[in-house]
Design a protein with these regions (language model features):
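Membrane-interface amphipathic segments in extracytoplasmic regions
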Residues: 1-407
């Protein structure tokens, strides 16, 4: 569904303080307060001040109410952690019920949640402590790594949910996956040599840990290996995804994707702000030869069919939504992100030993943020994924205790 631009206000000031966005009455709210109290408005302030406010009104929107159920297919190495962080911050501030287990950060089989070799099943949630509460209240969001099954996710979220995912150029995605997960330890060679010795030589390649490897994006989206090797099955999957997903974002056009996500979810553009999470250090990125890139692209043909189709679809959605409007919102979103970085980030660090434990990422190969912890809202822009999920779990347990008291 395409939505026009919501009413927006811009303010100008010479005395920067904390980020704000504005609702009609009162006019001024710090962005931190607005997010904490779940203000649903797309009216936001271009400065960081609560003084000398000058307002400029733009066109209004037909957007009726914010979406409160979201199914996010978290693909591997596609900027999905940043999208997940955006969704989790919104869900946290809205007291949402998250689809999760009582421990861990994935949604694989309960016997081993981190091995994503079987499609998600709603039956896996029967033993979670908040099962009865969720049966009564419903779940609001599924946003963790899983092997997707549209029907089973719909069974959990119920009516009214919006479904989104994100894709990335398959060669770049595979290079990132290979080096982030350290496949070089598995195959005893770097990616350049792997392309030559394995792919070029047509040697059989098993999935690492039974779920990581070739055409990873289609695998994440629920396809089995036999079907991924079948051109007709791949095209049928793409067609089905086009029907199932309300928005397929593209990592290489990230800000435009978030502008459209703001439309799809009917959320303020201010809620699309983020820091770039899990970005690798330059030293951890392997530059491939053109020959190896070509071999990889041919080898990843199925993911390329998927990627190219939805890349065109994103352009189509941008045109329908209004290309000039999207571009304008992209500029605005970048300004908002700059403000978040200015207000919240004390330092971008390579050596995570200087960070408190909440902000240390899973991999030593990625950049991390030293966050100004004196500002409560800032924390959740830069907190590590696992620590954020644990905090959400604690909040969910608190809601469960209150729910039980009211029985």
């Amino acid at each position: 569904m395409t939505l026009t631009l919501m009413t927006r206000f811009l303010a100008v000031s010479n005395q920067p303080q904390a980020p704000i966005f504005i609702k009609p009455v009162p006019e001024n709210y710090f962005l931190a307060d607005a997010l904490q109290h779940g203000i649903q408005t797309k009216q936001l302030n271009e400065s960081l001040s609560t003084q000398n406010i000058g307002l400029v009104e733009e066109e209004s929107s037909v957007c009726s109410q914010p979406i409160s159920k979201v199914g996010f297919m978290k693909t591997h190495k596609t900027a999905s952690s940043t999208v997940q962080n955006i969704l989790m911050r919104y869900g946290m501030n809205s007291d949402w019920n998250f689809v999760m287990y009582s421990a861990g950060s994935h949604l694989g089989p309960p016997s081993n949640q981190y091995t994503l070799n079987r499609p998600f099943s709603s039956s896996w949630l029967r033993d979670v402590p908040w099962h009865d509460m969720a049966q009564e209240q419903g779940y609001n969001i599924l946003a963790f790594h899983t092997k997707w099954d549209q029907g089973e996710v719909e069974r959990v979220l119920g009516d009214g949910a919006k479904y989104i995912t994100i894709l990335r150029d398959p060669v770049d995605e595979f290079e990132s996956l290979y080096n982030y997960v350290h496949f070089e330890k598995t195959f005893q060679m770097d990616l350049e040599q792997f392309v030559s010795d394995y792919i070029g030589a047509r040697r059989p390649i098993q999935r690492v840990n039974r779920y990581l490897g070739r055409n990873q994006q289609l695998w994440d989206l629920g396809m089995v290996q036999e079907d991924i090797n079948n051109h007709q099955a791949v095209m049928m999957k793409i067609k089905q995804m086009d029907q199932d997903f309300d928005l397929v974002m593209i990592a290489e056009d990230f800000e435009s994707s978030l502008v459209l996500l703001s439309d799809v979810l009917c959320w303020p553009l201010a809620n699309m702000t983020s820091l770039k999470l899990n970005a690798r250090k330059k030293s951890a990125i392997e530059k491939l030869s053109q020959k190896s890139q070509k071999i990889l692209k041919d080898w990843l043909w199925a993911d390329y069919k998927l990627y190219e189709y939805f890349k065109k679809e994103l352009e189509h959605k941008k045109n329908i939504s209004g290309l000039q409007r999207v571009r304008k919102d992209v500029v605005e979103l970048k300004k908002l992100n700059d403000k978040v970085k200015d207000e919240c980030v004390l330092e971008v660090v390579k050596n995570t030993k200087t960070l408190s434990s909440d902000f240390v990422p899973w991999s030593k190969d990625v950049l991390a943020f030293k966050i100004d912890e004196s500002k409560d809202t800032c924390k959740y822009f830069g907190i590590s994924e696992n620590h954020f999920i644990e905090h959400l779990r604690e909040l969910q347990m608190e809601r469960l205790k209150k729910w039980r008291l009211n029985l």
